[in-house]
Amino acid sequence: MPKKFQGENSKSAAARARRAEAKAAADAKKQKELEDAYWKDEDKHVMRKEQRKEEKEKRRLEQLERKKETQRLLEEEDSRLKGGKAPRVAPAKVTRAQIEDSLRREQRAEPVEKAKSHLELPLEENLNRRLQEEGSVEARTVEDAIAVLSVAEEADRHPERRMRAAFTAFEEVQLPRLKQENPNMRLSQLKQLLKKEWLRSPDNPMNQRALPFNAPK
């Protein structure tokens, strides 16, 4: 007679069940790790994408701001140029007091030089020398000669100092005016313009040398 089937061993079944459960747990853990890694990579990709988008927008806004600033500066410059030159200001007269004040400053800054007066030289020598220098003055009498010498002595005792002092006073008054009238000129151009005006100015001692000794002051 064949043996009767007695069924599966309970211990073997329990062991198989435990192995199956452990394998299922390991598989579930591995699957979870794979899913976590996937979503982690996806999050990084999304973050990088968002970061690049933000940086691109930031650069666009910066470029737009620079364009606006450049346009504003161009409009200001165009408006200033279209406005034309500043209103012309009437030339200010250099006064005798200003010239004398500049002369005094020059004299204080330089050593005092002793010069012979007309009293230390013969009248004829003074007269001839002054007539040669001035050319346009004629003295027919002793009184005229004294007048010529007095005027010449006052005007030309220190001609180089007087010229520098007069030009300094002229520049102090006229250069600010030229800057206001010609805001687009460089300083070198303004000084060239100032020299041209100085050559024609009645404040230039060289323009006063040819005046007759008895001309009204």
UniProtKB/Swiss-Prot annotation:
Residues modified to Phosphoserine: S136, S188
One annotated Gene Ontology cellular component of this protein: centrosome
Keywords: Cell cycle, Cell division, Coiled coil, Cytoplasm, Cytoskeleton, Phosphoprotein
Keyword Coiled coil: yes
Region (Disordered): 1-120
Regions annotated as coiled coil: 15-82
GO BP field: cell division
Biased composition (Basic and acidic residues): 18-74, 98-120
Location of this chain's protein in the cell: Cytoplasm, Cytoskeleton, Microtubule organizing center, Centrosome; Midbody
InterPro entries named in the record: Ccdc124/Oxs1, Ccdc124/Oxs1_C
Pfam families according to UniProt: Ccdc124
Function: Ribosome-binding protein involved in ribosome hibernation: associates with translationally inactive ribosomes and stabilizes the nonrotated conformation of the 80S ribosome, thereby promoting ribosome preservation and storage. Also required for proper progression of late cytokinetic stages.
PANTHER family found in the cross-reference section: COILED-COIL DOMAIN-CONTAINING PROTEIN 124
Family stated for the protein in its record: Belongs to the CCDC124 family.
Oligomer and partners: Associates with translationally inactive ribosomes in the nonrotated state. Interacts with RASGEF1B.
Protein name: Coiled-coil domain-containing protein 124
Source organism (scientific name): Mus musculus (Mouse)
